[in-house]
Amino acid sequence: EFRRVLFRSTVMFFLAVASIAANAKESKKEGDNYHAKQILIVGLHDNVKSNYFYNGMIAEETGMKADSIDQTYNTIIAENIAASVKNGDCKFIPANATQVTGQVLNEIKVNGESEDCYSDLSAVPTEELQKVLDNADADYLLVLNQHYLKWQDQPLRTLFHIVSYTLFDKDKNEVYRGNNFFTCMNLENPDKLRKSSRKSSSKIASTIIKTLDED
């Protein structure tokens, strides 16, 4: 009987601790000083690359305009990332066409090849980056470095869509870099691409959220 009482007391204690911790977290979220971490997403120009397809082929197969393929891919992935996070400590903001100035966008360099790409902000003026982030009420910049369309014939005909990305803080420090991919049988039109890339985009968001939670 004593052991049973002790067990119940122990369980009640841990439940109480868990409840207090949960309430404390909620109180923090509701407090005047609470601010969800906001991440501005920007896709680079001419960042759709492939080991097989060229822009004319992509345009013909997908119905996209050849001169806006990069914009279409960037928009779809950015919007999927943002839509995958309904609430919580992070919010993703897809940048619009005028939100990121040329002094920032045009100075971002991409290093690496194929699926292993990462961005370099060393040439970006720090004050310009901070101005862009402040205007968007954002704390971090997520750069979609490249969409690499990797085609393979063997063992199965498969198209890998590999999205590489880099996360920076306001001081141009790299916080995280990585990539994620999804597969399909052929090039897809924008509507199908949006659907096919949802799970992969959600994984990018969850990886970034986990990284920022560890800071």
What role is predicted for each listed range?
Residues 1-6:
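Short, small-residue-biased leader/transition segments that mark boundaries at the very start
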Residues 54-141, 177:
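N-terminal segment of the mature soluble domain
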Residues 17, 142-143:
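Conserved short hydrophobic patches within well-ordered secondary structure
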Residues 8-12:
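Sec-dependent signal peptide hydrophobic core
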Residues 13-22:
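Hydrophobic h-region of N-terminal signal peptides that target proteins for export
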Residues 25-53, 132-137, 148-215:
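C-terminal/domain-edge helix-coil "capping" segments
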Residues 44, 96-98, 145-147:
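Short, well-ordered beta-to-alpha junction loops that form the rim of enzyme active sites
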